[in-house]
């Protein structure tokens, strides 16, 4: 490798230059797929498309609170913890250190999908789990339920969590009392002692919590034997993948930008970073290896559970979107709240993530409308505000300024090219591109793989 020569004499640094050559680190780039709204945008479908020729598909954050649905050969597979790209028999699936793993949930999910079709045959041979990933225990899930109950009793409203133990396990992680995959597979005796301490801590915080410590450990020992062959040093694995022969590496974000612990509509968020920064911290890789960042955007907006939702349509429009879009959560089965597309929210998500292109999904759900509204600005006390408010009370008070566009009022589900879309549907897509200054790469007009129109 030839290095560019440096000349210490002409250095612009105040103390001269050490004379070492400076080169930008090379290696493969990862392609990232992230949710740009409140989740349920159709990330699984975009990942499924990209995973067809990928070598490695990764999850970097969250747990089995996420829900992705992928349809292959008319079989519908549901994923919560496993990267949905594992459905490709040539893919290595990697669960990074930022993911929290509920072992019974992992095996149950795999077994359910194995029974549905051939997509998951031999999954254990193609899954790698970072040894630094934290473990979700049953008592984390039980505590999650108790916390929700307490919030309901004390404040009259809960956070609407999935009760999968996500908040409690990330709390244990931050409090440095959590247990990781490396603890489980390295020394079960030491792991058992630390498990007992953590379980007893939880029992003292939640007196109604019942934990069968010995029974749990017995089960965990069984899981340990099954999981051990899959556990590897995740940092080393990914470094080798990035710096070895050319590979297509895909990162499948869970949840979405507005559910991010830092940038989402706090406190009605998840407990991890589901923006692009979570890719680096959740996999153990530097930012210069991040390549394309695809934002997945539903053609309208949905949200599960409570929290501010400026463009929500609590009326016939919202009901029509809910019914036509079959808007029920994959993980909880809860009805999703529905509203018009919100470009203020998307501009904010773009500021954080730097999307290189968008996938616009479920455009066909808007087929019935003669006119379609798009939120283009927020007003507070009659004045347009230039930012997305952090405070939930403020966000609840904003008045949305809409742009009304003509609908197409025709079935677009059989369109396979952009030109086959009605002119008003084309204009809707172009309007979004112009307002956000991000190109739309895919348009979803139905459930199947074939119904994703690729523009470039």
UniProtKB/Swiss-Prot annotation:
Function: Plays an important role in the de novo pathway and in the salvage pathway of purine nucleotide biosynthesis. Catalyzes the first committed step in the biosynthesis of AMP from IMP.
SMART domains: Adenylsucc_synt
Residues binding substrate: 40, 330-336
CDD domains: AdSS
Binding site residues for Mg(2+): 40, 67
Subcellular compartments: Cytoplasm; Mitochondrion
Binding residue positions for IMP: 40-43, 65-68, 162, 176, 255, 270, 334
A GO MF term: adenylosuccinate synthase activity
Positions of GTP binding: 39-45, 67-69, 336, 362-364, 444-447
Subunit structure: Homodimer.
Gene name for this UniProt entry: ADSS2
EC code: 6.3.4.4
Cited InterPro entries: Adenylosuccin_syn_GTP-bd, Adenylosuccin_syn_Lys_AS, Adenylosuccinate_synth_dom1, Adenylosuccinate_synth_dom2, Adenylosuccinate_synth_dom3, Adenylosuccinate_synthetase, AdSS_2_vert, P-loop_NTPase
Protein name, UniProt field: Adenylosuccinate synthetase isozyme 2
GO BP: 'de novo' AMP biosynthetic process; IMP metabolic process
Catalytic residues, chain numbering: 40, 68
CC cofactor note: Binds 1 Mg(2+) ion per subunit.
GO CC aspect terms: cytoplasm; mitochondrion
Record PANTHER family: ADENYLOSUCCINATE SYNTHETASE, ADENYLOSUCCINATE SYNTHETASE ISOZYME 2
Reaction(s) catalysed by this chain's protein: IMP + L-aspartate + GTP = N(6)-(1,2-dicarboxyethyl)-AMP + GDP + phosphate + 2 H(+)
UniProt region (Disordered), positions on chain: 1-26
Pathway(s) where this gene product acts: Purine metabolism; AMP biosynthesis via de novo pathway; AMP from IMP: step 1/2
Regulation acting on activity, per entry: Inhibited competitively by AMP and IMP and non-competitively by fructose 1,6-bisphosphate.
